[in-house]
């Protein structure tokens, strides 16, 4: 394979060392990896709001033992993992990409459909809308209707021998 392209996927994969080894094995020598995923700082405010709401009122019992669904790595850590997997000419950098919403309802719908699935599946159906609305309200306390994306961009070339 000459090129592997990925967007918004790597942060869902728990074992990045294995992932990068497999990608290096799939590429021809000098093949390129171009990817973007969530970084260590991705949705930090949003995750904080989720954690606060999970710990309030009737919600804690539903989230006992919940594992974080994301593997959000730092640029430096990702670079080291890629190099260890057989990539050279590795370039990793962060890009802030805040996503703004026009209304609290729009933000809550986005959270419910895009970000909170792993959390909502633990809740009774009757609690899901309320949970998403509470997370949205917690985010809005700073006067902004924003999800704070910080993307990790990756460019790498497979070394001749892996």
Language-model region placement:
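A conserved beta-strand element that flanks and buttresses the S-adenosyl-L-methionine
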Residues: 5
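A short, conserved alpha-helix within the catalytic core of class I
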Residues: 13-23
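A short helix-coil junction within the Rossmann-fold of NAD(P)-dependent oxidoreductases
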Residues: 22-25, 158
């Amino acid at each position: 394979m000459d090129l592997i392209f990925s967007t918004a996927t790597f942060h869902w994969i728990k074992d990045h060392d294995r992932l990068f080894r497999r990608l290096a094995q799939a590429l021809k020598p000098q093949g390129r990896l171009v990817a973007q995923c969530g970084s260590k700082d991705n949705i930090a405010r949003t995750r904080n709001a989720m954690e606060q709401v999970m710990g309030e009122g009737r919600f804690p019992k539903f989230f006992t033992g919940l594992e974080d669904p994301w593997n959000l790595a730092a640029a430096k850590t990702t670079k080291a993992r890629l190099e260890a997997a057989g990539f050279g000419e590795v370039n990793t950098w962060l890009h802030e990409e805040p996503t703004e919403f026009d209304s609290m309802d729009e933000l809550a719908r986005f959270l419910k459909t895009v970000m909170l699935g792993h959390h909502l599946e633990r809740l009774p159906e009757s609690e899901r809308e309320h949970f998403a609305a509470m997370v949205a309200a917690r985010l809005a306390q700073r006067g902004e209707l924003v999800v704070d994306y910080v993307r990790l961009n990756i460019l790498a070339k497979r070394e001749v021998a892996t």
